[in-house]
Amino acid sequence: MKVTVLVGGVGGARFLLGVQHLLGLGQFARDDARDPDAHEVTAVVNVGDDTWMFGVRICPDLDTCMYTLGGGIDPDRGWGHRDETWHAKEELAAYGVQPDWFGLGDRDLATHLVRSQMLRAGYPLSQVTEALCDRWNPGARLLPASDDRSETHVVITDPDTDERRAIHFQEWWVRYRAKVPTHSFAFVGADKATTAPGVTDAIADADVVLLAPSNPVVSIGSILAIPGIRGALRSTSAKIIGYSPIIAGKPLRGMADECLSVIGVASTSEAVGRHYGARSGTGILDGWLVHEGDSAQIDGVEVEAVPLLMTDPATTAEMVRAGVRLAGVTL
């Protein structure tokens, strides 16, 4: 079975662990598997968070997925490298290097240095990611949504000057924690970007396409902003099943509610499902999973309520199983 998943960072990576647990891949590979090549997982990963910082290219969501599936993630934070140290960050601070609100761990820095060296040598991000994954063996194909620049920027009212300005998503998220007056999001470069090699084929050839319960605005929304992806979703023969990132009016994790508020979408499972829309209309969904106790009525979309708390890979695997079942695919 071929499963293609659209994902963001921490939540998306944990969802991918559930996919692998269900299919017996990656860390959950079984020695007695009849056919270890029977299943294939491809993750189309958000690149809107990517940025140059301290002279290196940082790809937070790609790295979080790579570290998580490769067993190198910091289990407490859910991002960054396990057993991290912060000597480089301390030295940069001692030199007074800005920005002082963003820190890179020493082990994590090695990843960024290798990536930046390869990018400067002319390799596209998709090839760089493949090379980095050779070290981690994540058990899934990780594809950046695009090799081109497609960064999420945020229009805010500057708290110091009271004037409107656009800042990179990382500054809004890390420095301001989304707690400044916010007016809009812009996917800079997305209109001129193209999908990375393999992305549209992964969607077209899939047996099922899953939208992880990642942020619908700055993760999934950023992916959908890249020309060609929405069209690939609308034309694939696979059923497209989405997972609500909202449980009882609150985000599963992160600050999805803050992002939804900016674009005028309520923080409910139904509102987010309607935001994605039905593929029978002009949207992208065939099915929509909401948390037990929640409900949603979306014309043209089959809705089912199941437990959506990703407490561990085994529990998350049952979420994935429910989505595959809703798509009518037999494991």
UniProtKB/Swiss-Prot annotation:
Q: Which domain of life is it from?
A: Bacteria
The record lists 7,8-didemethyl-8-hydroxy-5-deazariboflavin as bound by 63
Say if the entry is tagged with keyword DNA damage. no
Name the pathway: Cofactor biosynthesis; coenzyme F420 biosynthesis
Q: Which UniProt keyword terms apply here?
A: Magnesium, Transferase
E.C. number(s) listed in UniProt:
2.7.8.28
Enzyme class, top EC level, equals transferase
Q: Which Pfam families match?
A: CofD
Catalyzed chemical reaction(s) = enolpyruvoyl-2-diphospho-5'-guanosine + 7,8-didemethyl-8-hydroxy-5-deazariboflavin = dehydro coenzyme F420-0 + GMP + H(+)
Please give the start and end residues of each transmembrane region: none
Question: Tell me, what does this protein do in biology?
Answer: Catalyzes the transfer of the phosphoenolpyruvate moiety from enoylpyruvoyl-2-diphospho-5'-guanosine (EPPG) to 7,8-didemethyl-8-hydroxy-5-deazariboflavin (FO) with the formation of dehydro coenzyme F420-0 and GMP.
Q: How does it assemble?
A: Homodimer.
* Family according to the record: Belongs to the CofD family.
Protein name (Swiss-Prot/TrEMBL): Phosphoenolpyruvate transferase
- What is the organism of origin for this protein? Mycobacterium sp. (strain JLS)
- Which gene carries the instructions for this protein? fbiA
